[in-house]
A protein has these predicted regions:
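Short secondary-structure boundary segments
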Residues: 39-40, 226-227, 254-256
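Short acidic/histidine-rich active-site segments
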Residues: 245-264
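Short, charged, surface-exposed secondary-structure boundary motifs
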Residues: 45-48, 213, 231-239, 261
Length: 275
């Protein structure tokens, strides 16, 4: 007879700093040992910007979850870590000064990675960020991760519709079936040029459109989010990937975020699917 004991787990990518107390208590009751909060996205708190966010905004996106993480640990009894990076889902000004803050932030024991970040054709608030400019900012973050020898969480974009969000989006015309691979190729060209060790790289939001490429053409870890109702990946999908390819390099995460529907039990359900 299979054991029904709760299996501890780590949620390697989430945005739960925007969640209420009760949601944290629910997550804490599922056996979670630790979470890694990805900071840098203003939409987590349902903010609407009329002007391009600047250095003070970015500092707040990062420092608020860093401060919150210690309180959350004391209240909910599991470890809370943070990754910091400039997300291209929101255009920002003064990004050079923002990047200068990262080395000092990474000295904090609860800040463990750069990211999530990755070239994205879609920006919130209709404030388009040209791809060529994104490449420059992205490369600087990759170089920083290599220099500091810290994990790098790579965001791969998902096709989006304005109705799924709180405000107008600046959108892309790349076909859905080519979407992730097209922008992942741009990211990987820069990552390989800089020489970032793939063992320090997590390629996140992986789905069937890029799975084979990531498995065969990289040595990176493979992040699959199972907790958002907006995504097509779910506990059953993760279990299917494990059955087809084995567990090596695979990382499950919730990618919970406050502006879409979420399944707070998604990772425990994934563990059950794997039994």
């Amino acid at each position: 007879m299979a054991s029904s004991a709760v299996i501890p787990y780590i949620d390697s990518h989430c945005h739960t700093h925007g969640f209420p107390y009760d949601a944290w208590e629910t997550i804490g009751s599922t056996g979670v040992a630790a979470v890694v909060i990805s900071a840098g996205n203003p939409h987590v708190h349902r903010e609407i910007h009329d002007e391009v966010p600047d250095l003070n905004d970015v500092r707040r996106y990062w420092e608020e979850p860093i401060r919150f993480s210690k309180s959350a640990e004391n209240m909910h009894f599991f470890k809370v870590f943070v990754g910091v990076g400039i997300s291209f889902m929101t255009r920002v000004d003064q990004w050079e000064q923002a990047l200068d803050l990262i080395p000092e932030l990474l000295k904090k024991s609860n800040v463990v990675a750069i990211g999530e970040t990755g070239i994205d054709p879609v920006q919130y608030f209709g404030m388009r960020w040209p791809i060529e400019e994104q490449k420059i900012v992205f490369e600087e973050q990759v170089r920083l991760a290599k220099k500091l020898d810290v994990p790098f969480i790579l965001h791969t974009p998902t096709p989006k519709k304005s109705r799924d969000f709180l405000h107008e989006l600046a959108v892309s015309e790349i076909p859905n079936e080519e979407y992730k691979r097209y922008f992942l190729d741009l990211d990987m060209e820069i990552i390989n040029k800089v020489g970032l060790d793939h063992k320090r790289l997590v390629i996140d939001h992986v789905d069937e459109t890029i799975l084979e490429y990531v498995l065969e053409e990289t040595d990176a870890y493979i992040g699959i989010g199972v907790g958002q109702t907006m995504r097509h990946t779910n506990p059953q999908y993760f279990a299917d990937v494990v059955e087809r390819h084995g567990p090596d390099r695979l990382m499950v995460n919730s990618d919970h975020v406050a502006y879409v529907g979420n399944d707070l039990l998604a990772i425990p359900k994934t563990i059950r699917e794997l039994r």
